[in-house]
Design a protein with these regions (language model features):
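Sec-dependent, cleavable N-terminal signal peptides
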Residues: 1-33
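Right-handed parallel beta-helix/beta-solenoid
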Residues: 29-60, 75-77, 100-102, 500-505, ...
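Acidic Gly/Asp/Thr-rich repetitive segments characteristic of extracellular carbohydrate-active
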Residues: 41-79, 83, 119, 484, ...
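Extracellular beta-strand-rich solenoid/capping regions of secreted or surface-exposed proteins
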Residues: 59, 63-67, 79-95, 104-132, ...
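Right-handed parallel beta-helix
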Residues: 74, 93, 97-103, 127-138, ...
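Short glycine/acidic-rich loop motifs that flank beta-strands on beta-rich extracellular proteins
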Residues: 78-84, 108-119, 140-149, 171-181, ...
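C-terminal accessory segments
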Residues: 457, 482-571
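Solvent-exposed beta-strand/loop surfaces, strongest in extracytoplasmic domains of secreted
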Residues: 576-694
Length: 694
């Protein structure tokens, strides 16, 4: 006994024993927190949540899951509104996702809506939660006071991810004064919602009244809204918002964001009483946002392609104009507007918009007193570079809203002090032949110019028309394009000529340019980051033009004094790129033994991608036998993908041939819908691959 006692007093041995105890405890806790659970429509919440004995409800799983947990939900319909009471951590997030190769449906049919409520609710101080691969659908209200939402995130937190979901049929039946959202994020605290990611989702068939399809509002920082497909909704597609009183004073701007790779179409307020039955819904909107990059997006058949401004003239109750990195502000009373500021809009395609392609400035005159949501805001240091615009302003407008305003619209409260820039853009006007439309007169309050324009290429099928093609500060009598250049001092290096698109008559239109195009090497690389916003954490921290063009090719050629850049969204490769669609089927492994499995992946890629992302479905075929049909979800503005697990038990011994059949996709004429859908990308089949069972 004496000997053993003395041995245990040896400090090295004591430390070793303690270490083993701590290690054992840590391993035990890790095993608990990194748990894997399962939910099934045939389960029971009294079960342990294993794959063999799953739970019945997603809510029970949410109540149970702690940091590090992963919850797999088997396919089926779950009629519930799910709240997440716990947070994950950066190293141990909480993940909820459909089981591999399946899609679980969260359906709101018949469920009540209380206040603002989602089918997915991440409310309060919540961090590191991922929701992936669900269909979220059918949630509605008849009450003006209630707001149904597909995904509702509010409060503060870090690292929330909403990935690869299909959100649809979220509606308010009282659109004149009501609201609904597809995905909505409200930062309501001095602590932001930050490192948010909304990616790979399809959001469609929404009736949102006075609200948006997807938004971030208030104190939301360092967010990414990327590679989503948003379509057939009756209000704004993606909106980054400030000054609405969602966040505290000085913390009320959605800022430091990346909105890229999205395809948005058929977005219009013309059938929405909440929008006054007008063509006023934006595909992309910076409404009081700050330091946001919009790039590599395709916007077609929206009312406005993109608008950067602020709807508010008095940003906060104490007159705070904006918060900055140090939360400083400037008074914003009266004629000094709030701004959508430091928005960089680059390498996008905007076409067939109903009212306007690109727009800056407040939609109404600022008043002497000023007020919230009066349209009296404006745009500050917003830079539009290397975009391609075609045939925008396709609708004549109506008595309440006036006529269409063409490709580039300049509204109110903008002048030389605001520093807005429009360069290196291809502007090809449609039937109304309006290239530039500026409401802004030359005044002392907002002295000319309302924006700096240069190095653009303008054209239209009808050619330049005096009194139509350019309206600038209530002056429209520019007899020729050169007369416009001389009298205004704008567009000194711009040209009026045919850009030589590869094929406007193809479906979709091919906006890449021929090798002989006048856009080649004709742009400018003279703008520095000091004139606008270059994301220091993005792909091009030192260039306002971006690192790649719309298709992902290098944005510039050469270096130093020999560097050049094309005009428009595409950098010419020296080869005329015809429209093409590629379906590719791959597998992680091509040889399986009994008991093994692999994952099949189909990608559908469009080039040069004028129709945006290929959507629809893909059929995984084993010989002539259908394994499963899966929905495609976007991975960029020109590519989508679907996956399916494949087990050895599904194969015959020896070589097995697999292919993937793409359905194709169509887009209806809009807006309103005025005919049958038009095929954008036709059906196609992948090359076969072989899986061998040994």
């Amino acid at each position: 006994m004496q000997s053993n006692f003395l041995t245990l007093r040896n400090p090295n041995i004591v430390y070793a024993v303690l270490f083993l105890l701590v290690l054992t405890l840590a391993t035990s806790l890790a095993g608990q927190t990194r748990a894997t659970y399962y939910v099934s429509t045939t389960g029971n919440d009294s079960n342990p949540g294993t794959i063999g004995a799953p739970w019945l409800t997603i809510q029970h799983a949410a109540n149970t899951a702690k940091a590090g947990a992963t919850v797999y939900v088997f396919e089926g319909v779950y009629n519930e509104s799910v709240n997440f009471p716990s947070s994950g951590t950066e190293s141990e997030p909480i993940t909820f996702q459909s089981y591999s190769g399946q899609t679980a449906v969260i359906d709101g049919t018949g469920l009540p809506v209380n206040g603002t409520q989602g089918l997915i609710n991440i409310v309060g101080k919540r961090s590191y939660i991922t929701v992936r691969g669900f269909e979220i659908r059918h949630y509605t209200t008849s009450s003006e006071n209630d707001v149904p939402t597909g995904v509702w995130i509010t409060g503060s937190g870090t690292g929330i991810q909403i990935l690869n979901n299909r959100v649809h049929d979220i509606t308010t039946k009282t659109e004149a004064n009501g609201n609904a959202f597809g995905i909505s994020v409200y930062g309501t605290s001095k602590t932001p919602i930050t490192q948010l990611r909304i990616s790979g989702n399809e959001v469609y068939d929404l009736r949102t009244g006075e609200s948006e399809s997807v938004n971030v509002d208030g104190n939301v920082t360092y967010f990414k809204i990327t590679n989503n497909l948003i379509h057939d909704n009756d209000n704004i597609g993606i909106d980054a918002i400030g000054y609405e009183g969602v966040g505290p004073v000085g913390y009320d701007e959605a800022m430091y964001g990346d909105i890229s790779g999205n395809t948005i179409y058929n977005i219009s307020g013309i059938t929405n009483p909440g929008e006054g039955y007008e063509y006023d819904a934006d595909g992309l909107y910076c409404d009081g946002c700050a330091y946001v990059t919009f790039e590599h997006n395709v916007i077609l058949q929206a009312d406005y392609g993109i608008e950067t401004t602020s709807e508010n003239q008095v940003c906060q109750s104490n007159g705070t104009e904006w918060s900055g990195p140090n939360n400083t502000g400037t008074a914003a009373k009266g004629r000094r507007p709030c701004y959508g500021r430091y928005a960089t809009v680059r390498n996008n395609i905007f076409y067939n918009s109903n009212a306007c392609g690109n727009s800056i400035g407040g939609y109404a005159h600022a008043s002497k007193k000023g007020s919230h949501s009066n349209g009296g805001g404006s745009s500050y240091r917003d830079v539009f570079v290397n975009n391609t615009l075609y045939n925008n302003a396709t609708q004549p407008g109506n008595d309440s809203e006036g006529g269409s305003t063409g490709e580039f619209q300049i509204q109110y409260q903008v002048g030389s002090a605001q520093g807005d820039i429009y360069e290196n853009n291809v502007v090809y006007a449609g039937a109304y032949d309006t290239w530039i439309f500026s409401y802004v007169p030359f005044t002392k309050i907002y002295p000319a110019p309302p924006a700096t324009l240069d190095w653009n290429l303008y054209n239209s099928a009808a050619g330049y028309a005096e009194g139509t093609s350019i309206w600038w500060g209530n002056v429209n009598r520019f007899k020729t394009f050169s007369n416009w250049q001389n009298r205004s001092g704008e567009d000194a290096h711009s040209v009026n000529t045919d850009p030589l698109f590869v094929d406007l008559g193809d479906t979709p239109p091919n906006f890449d340019t021929l090798p002989s195009s006048p856009v080649v090497g004709a742009g400018s690389v003279s703008l520095s980051c000091s004139v606008g916003w270059c994301d220091p954490d993005g792909s091009s921290p030192d260039s306002i033009y971006g690192s790649t063009d719309f298709l992902g090719n290098p944005r510039t050629k050469g270096s130093g004094v020999n560097m050049d850049i094309d005009i428009g969204a595409y950098e010419n490769t020296g080869v005329a790129v015809a429209n093409s669609l590629t379906v590719n089927l791959s597998a992680r492994r091509h040889t399986l033994k009994p008991g093994q499995a692999t994952t099949l992946t189909v990608t559908v890629s469009a080039s040069p991608g004028g129709g945006g992302v290929p959507s629809g479905t893909v059929e995984f075929m084993l010989g002539s036998r259908l394994l499963k049909k899966r929905p495609l979800l976007p991975t960029s503005a020109t590519e989508s993908a679907a996956t399916l697990p494949l087990s050895a038990s599904q194969l015959a011994e020896g070589a097995n041939t697999l292919t993937a059949l793409y359905s194709g996709n169509s887009i209806a004429p809009c807006c309103p819908v005025s005919g049958p859908p038009v095929t954008v990308y036709g059906s196609a089949t992948s090359a076969p691959i072989t899986e061998t069972l040994q």
